């Protein structure tokens, strides 16, 4: 059977029907020490221009189940063009319109949840976007990303979180066109980033906490068989470690899929521990896995620009 990107994993995730005991797990923050490189290398003008284009060795869609890494790269570029996109800004409103327009063009029917978040900076208007793709059975596979950027001067967030937003848009393009065994929902969260400089609860994960609470009230939270979060997945030297705060069974499954596809060099077995949007759901008993490379030297710096993004990396993550 020829499966679209993520289909192997989505089918396998649907088998994880056993309830998960309620956990309290530890946007995006790692226990590992990371930071910007002390000195940026000197790069020629030609090299800089080339870095603004998709990689020549990006695998074609026919090799990645239909996922088009170059299309995803273009989605990253479009987000970067809007500039810094912190929650409540004019730029994030433009991104919201872009996401909604793209989803509608794919035949998806996006739902928008507009809400007001209480933050250290006062009330901020935010929006979650959710696509519900029907399936033949009631179980739900939830794919997710955040689309806001950290409020830092000149921070355009090509990787954090332009890359994962682009991956989810490309998956929506493929998945909205067909009906699967289980429902697939794709969520775009606002407000993952802390408003203050430091990540401290409750100043983070505004959008994912909002959605998890609403789904708990509606009863849909109990129908989620697996929650797959992507965040910071576009690096040219992508290395995704196993998150100790993700469900072990689901992590094992994803890493096995990656190995079988030949991506063991990207999905590595080194451990890490990440605080991210997945914990809004894992603390409510949902099986979750976080796909993220937080050990990038340009994390939360103005150097998180389009030239750091690899269309090949986007294709690899989308394929898995």
Describe these PLM feature segments:
Residues 2-15:
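Bacterial N-terminal signal peptides that target proteins for export
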Residues 24-27:
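C-terminal motif of bacterial Sec signal peptides marking the signal peptidase cleavage site
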Residues 29-31:
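Bacterial signal peptide processing site
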Residues 49-93, 106, 148-149, 297-305:
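N-terminal capping segment at the start of a domain
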Residues 63-66, 112, 116, 226, ...:
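Active-site-adjacent substrate-binding region
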Residues 65-72, 85-96, 140, 157-165, ...:
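Solvent-exposed, acidic/flexible segments
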Residues 78-136:
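A non-catalytic alpha/beta surface segment that caps or lines the substrate-entry region
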Residues 151-253, 262, 270-273, 278:
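Acidic/histidine-rich catalytic neighborhood of metal-dependent amide-processing enzymes
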């Amino acid at each position: 059977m020829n499966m679209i990107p993520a289909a192997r994993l989505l089918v396998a995730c649907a088998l994880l029907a056993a309830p998960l005991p309620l956990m309290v797990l530890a946007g995006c923050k790692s226990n590992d020490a990371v930071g910007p490189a002390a000195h940026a290398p000197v790069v020629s003008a030609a090299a800089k221009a080339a870095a603004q284009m998709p990689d020549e060795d990006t695998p074609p869609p026919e090799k990645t189940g239909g996922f088009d890494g170059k299309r995803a790269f273009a989605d990253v570029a479009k987000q970067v063009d809007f500039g810094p996109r912190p929650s409540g800004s004019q730029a994030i409103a433009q991104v919201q319109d872009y996401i909604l327009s793209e989803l509608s063009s794919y035949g998806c029917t996006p739902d928008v949840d507009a809400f007001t978040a209480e933050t250290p900076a006062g009330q901020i208007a935010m929006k979650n976007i959710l696509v519900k793709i029907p399936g033949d059975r009631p179980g739900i596979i939830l794919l997710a990303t955040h689309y806001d950027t950290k409020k830092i001067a000149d921070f355009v967030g090509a990787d954090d979180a332009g890359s994962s937003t682009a991956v989810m848009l490309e998956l929506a393009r493929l998945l909205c066109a067909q009906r699967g065994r289980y429902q697939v929902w794709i969520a775009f969260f606002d407000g993952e980033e802390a408003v203050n400089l430091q990540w401290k609860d409750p100043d983070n994960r505004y959008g994912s906490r909002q959605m998890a609470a609403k789904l708990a009230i509606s009863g849909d939270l109990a129908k989620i068989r697996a929650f797959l979060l992507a965040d910071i997945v576009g690096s040219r030297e992508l290395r995704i470690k196993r998150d100790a705060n993700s469900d072990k069974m689901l992590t094992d499954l994803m890493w096995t899929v990656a190995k079988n596809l030949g991506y063991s060099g990207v999905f590595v077995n080194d451990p890490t521990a990440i605080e991210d949007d997945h914990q809004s759901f894992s603390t409510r008993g949902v099986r979750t896995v976080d796909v993220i490379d937080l050990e990038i030297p340009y994390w939360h710096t103005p150097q998180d620009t389009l030239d750091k993004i690899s269309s090949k990396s986007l294709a690899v993550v989308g394929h898995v």
